[in-house]
Structures are given as structure tokens and as C-alpha cells.
Amino acid sequence: MLGTLRNLYLNSFLYDKKISKPFISSLKYKSSTYLLSSLVKIQTKKINIDEFVFDAVWTNGNLSNKQFKKLNNFFWIFSLDLKSSSSSVQKIIENWIEINSKYTSKSWEFDTTSKRIISWLTNTKLTYDNSSEEYKNNFNFIIQKQTLHLLNQINNLKKY
């Protein structure tokens, strides 16, 4: 019963409004892959993103749960060649934001969301740099929103 009520709340307009409050106006983040080497397994074989088609990837209902998590946590960005088109990566993120800007239990699952934030912020050369102001605003907003969601989840764990 409590889980059902919590799930209703997490999918509500009130919860979306709660985690949609921006707390910083812009993102200034430059990362080093060395800092996260203990968390992330970086592949030596690099992939060029321009060799793939990602038009309907976020709406593909044929993915297994494992494939869905791998796709949505964005850790595959660590396998990309830095010579890949940043505009292609940014378009993929932009599409993800359009479809997943509101909480859903599957794409906003705690582990998946935390990995997605790590991936996006660690790979700013592809995910953020050389993008439009509109994209940066949307990116900053969704990073903050996901962070607030994670903080909310952590705070709720402490209560139980």
C-alpha cells in the first residue's frame, strides 16, 4: 500500500514540480577521466557515434531490461571516440530529455539515473561543449532535476 502511494506521488505533477526547481543558473564542469577510473570501466576500443542511427531508440519497446538500463545510463558514451560528432551525442541527449523529462520508474531508477549523471558530466566534451544556449539550459535543468530526484530518494531511504 505504501509503495503504491509512493509510486503515485513520484508520477504526480506535485513531485515533478518539486524536483524541477533549478538551484544553479549554469553548469561549469570540467572533468578528468582519471577521477572516475575506479567507478567506470573505460574501453580502449573507441566507437564513432556517427556510424549509428538513433532516431527511435528511446521508444524501442523490444529492449530487454538489461539493454534498457545500459542505453539509459549512457555509460556507452565512455566508449565513444572523442572525434565523434558532439552534435550527434547532444541530439541523442536532447531526444532523451524530450521523452524522459518527467519521472518514470524505469528510466529514472536510482542506479540508472546516477550513472547517467556521471556519464553526462564526465564527457562534457561530447555532451555539453560547443552546444547552443537553449541546449545548455535544457541540459543544466535536467541534470539538476535528476540530482534533486536522487537527493529526494536518499532522504526517503533515511526515513525508513
In which residue ranges do the predicted regions lie?
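Extreme N-terminal leader/anchor segments
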Residues: M1-F54
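Generic preference for well-ordered secondary structure
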Residues: F23-S26, I42, N60-S64, N100, ...
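Repeat-mediated protein-protein interaction surfaces in helical alpha-solenoids
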Residues: V53-G61
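Aromatic-lined, polymer-binding surfaces characteristic
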Residues: S64-Y160
